[in-house]
Each structure stands twice: as structure tokens, then as C-alpha cells.
Curated annotation (Swiss-Prot):
This is SPARC. The keyword Signal applies. Its main location: secreted. The keyword Isomerase does not apply. Belongs to the SPARC family. Disulfide bonds join C70-C81, C75-C91, C93-C128, C99-C121, C110-C147, C153-C263, C271-C287. Residues 69-91 form the Follistatin-like domain. One of its GO terms (cellular component) is platelet alpha granule membrane. CDD domains: EFh_SPARC_SPARC (cd16235), FSL_SPARC (cd01328). It comes from Rattus norvegicus. Residues 1-17 form the signal peptide.
Amino acid sequence: MRAWIFFLLCLAGRALAAPQTEAAEEMVAEETVVEETGLPVGANPVQVEMGEFEEGAEETVEEVVAENPCQNHHCKHGKVCELDESNTPMCVCQDPTSCPAPIGEFEKVCSNDNKTFDSSCHFFATKCTLEGTKKGHKLHLDYIGPCKYIAPCLDSELTEFPLRMRDWLKNVLVTLYERDEGNNLLTEKQKLRVKKIHENEKRLEAGDHPVELLARDFEKNYNMYIFPVHWQFGQLDQHPIDGYLSHTELAPLRAPLIPMEHCTTRFFETCDLDNDKYIALEEWAGCFGIKEQDINKDLVI
């Protein structure tokens, strides 16, 4: 639990600086979007950016004419721009050896075949060379950090995961609300929802709480958790916004959580009740104990 609290304080605290630093951080760089100006209002600063996982996105070209045609020709992760014989820009696989040398362990990533790469650049460059192959199709970035032993998730542990996750989502929103003044961390509609949670005297403060207390608090203060669960769904449902979460859309939340919470993968797998590889809002909310009558698409704001 202490890891969750540390994760919350450090990353939610990053929200104060994040709106102006996104484009400079490789780990949060968008694959297909040109220069970013900051976190969208109401975005979750805790999850890594969706662009890190958009492996199938198309390259884009700006209409601005440049002396170097490659200057405004943007390639997805793992590819770089080169000019062909007719001076036309094209995206080709990047040589992994051309990736910047990693600064530290925090830049390393682990693939779903349990191989550690020096950075996301090295991973995507390698994946690009496998395009069109069965191995390349199955290869994905699993989580941030070097590969480590992930213990099996026991049934008893699986039941505890949503207790901590719900409490964490609530605390992330409250922290954003408290630090929102002048920072546009939340939209006005989101502020109105979170204000009620923040001002409720019965709210359980962030802390290293036993799961028994978290379970009792959810039962006593159930209404406080309805919006945070919907809010997080909306943060992930972005490409496209269709009311379903794909593996790629879940990745920005899964990747930083797996090293700390070994039940992360199994939890999200159990949420997919119909095994269609997508998690609908109803499945997501149900996984967190939200009653069917309280699941409301209008709360995904």
C-alpha cells in the first residue's frame, strides 16, 4: 500500500509541472501527434500517455513547407524519416543502435515476452523490424521498468486489488482538486463532482489503510467512489472514444502499475466478462463494485 501512496503523491504532484513538460519527455511522447502544448484539462497525470502505446498509428505530414521535407513528416515510434531518391519523405524502421543511451534504470521497459529493453525507443525500433511477422504482431510493451519476477496473483489478492484501486482513484481526484487553482487540472464539470467528495467530512483520508477499512469505507461511503471510477474510464477511452477499452487503451494505466501491483493484469482480464478483448463501461464499473443502476455514461466527463 505504501507504494500506492508514494506513486500517488509523486505522480499527482507532477501535475503541477506536467502541463508544460509533456513534449520534452520521451516516455510520454505522442507517436502521431505533432508538438504538444500540455496535458488536456481533466487528464490523469498518473497514467503514462496513450501515444506511448499506439503502435499502429499512421504517420502524419504537416502542410507547412520546410527546407527539409522530413522536418514536418512525423513517424510513429520505432520509425524515422528518410528521403527517397525523389526527395520524398518516408518513414523507415529506426536502427536500435541510434537510440539515445539510457540515463538510468527508470528508462528501461519490459516487453510481454519478458525481455528488458534499454528504453522505449529501443523497444519500438526492434518491434518495427519485426513488422509483418507473427512475432512482431504479438510483441507489446508490457510495463515500465526492467523485467522482474511478477508473482502469480492469488484469488484472495485479486479481491483486494479493486479496494486499493478505488481508494487510489478517489485520492488522485481529490489531490488534483486541491492543487487545481490556476493549473486547469480539472474541467469545471469535474470540479463540481470532486468538490462534493472533497468537502464530505466522512471521506477517508489518504493513508496506508488495511483492506478491511477500505472495504468498510466503500460500503459506508459508496457514493464517493462512483464518479472516480467513471472518470478513470474516460481518461483511458480515447483512441477512439467509443465506450470500450482496448488493450492499447488500458496500457497507459497498466504499465506503471504492474511492477507495484502484481494482480494488475489478472484484474483487467477478469473485467472482460464476455472475453471479446474489450472492456465496456458496464464491465469496468462492475469490476470496481459499482452497482448497475449507478453506471451512467454521462459521468464519463
